[in-house]
Every structure is written in C-alpha cells, then in structure tokens.
C-alpha cells in the first residue's frame, strides 16, 4: 500500500478490526520507510445500483442523498447523527436485499418513511410532506390520521 506521506510502497498492517457493522475491515498501517501511520478500509464491492426517478431518468444510488433528506426532515429534533446513520444503513440494506440492479425512488422513499415513522413522528411528517407531494390539507390530514392510528394500534 502506498504511503500518503512519502509515496513509498512499503507499509505493514499494525491493527485490523471489523468496521461498519462487519461490512468493512479497518486497517491501521505504518510506512516502513518514514514511519507515518494511516488508516485504510477494505469493503465488499457491491454491484452498481441505479435509482429510477419519477421522470424515468436513472442515477446512481446515493447514501448521502438519503442522509441529507432525513437530516433535513429531522432538523431540530432529538435525533442523533448515529440514529440518522443507522436509519440510512437500514434503508440501504433493504434496497440491497432486493437483489436488483435498479430500484424506483418511490420504493426507497417508502423504506425511508417506514423507518422514520418508528424513529420520530415530526421527522416522518416533514419527510412525507415532500415525498408524497400533498396537494391539499385533506391529504396531509389523512396521512397524519393514518400515522396516529398506526401508533395507537402498536400500543
């Protein structure tokens, strides 16, 4: 592995441990030439996944895009960054378990909404208001009533 400090190819692994819920290996390395220590990650290479948008266009799947959306919905809510990351992990796992090369943005949005509903009611409503593109107050109220009924049923 090339040292990012002196660019020599002589390094050794001094520590190795699982990372990212056992989906990656984190390795601490030390350059045998200059002694510089650095970290590398080894991950399973996954097949490219395309998201089919509502207008039919396709774009690469992006964890960052999902994370940005849920963080915006959960702004000023008592949700930690670890909870946001965990939610995105759950959504990505559901998507990858489908075993397909393309998935609709609607399906991804539904996965996000399902997990947000369990995490925070306000974040769920905020996300739903954009994702579902409410046309009027009655469709918004229907979503709120459905969510409240689901919560009552669960208790």
From Swiss-Prot:
InterPro entries: ATP-cone_dom (IPR005144), NrdR-like_N (IPR055173), RNR_NrdR-like (IPR003796)
Stretches annotated zinc finger (unnamed): 3-34
Span of domain ATP-cone: 49-139
Free-text comment on the cofactor: Binds 1 zinc ion.
Listed Polar residues bias regions: 1-11
Keywords: ATP-binding, DNA-binding, Metal-binding, Nucleotide-binding, Repressor, Transcription, Transcription regulation, Zinc, Zinc-finger
Region (Disordered), start-end ranges: 1-22
One GO process term, biological-process aspect: negative regulation of DNA-templated transcription
Cofactors required: Zn(2+)
MF terms (GO), sorted A to Z: ATP binding; DNA binding; zinc ion binding
Family the UniProt entry places it in: Belongs to the NrdR family.
Family annotation (NCBIfam families): transcriptional regulator NrdR (TIGR00244)
Protein purpose: Negatively regulates transcription of bacterial ribonucleotide reductase nrd genes and operons by binding to NrdR-boxes.
HAMAP family cross-referenced by the UniProt entry: NrdR
Name of the protein described by the UniProt record: Transcriptional repressor NrdR
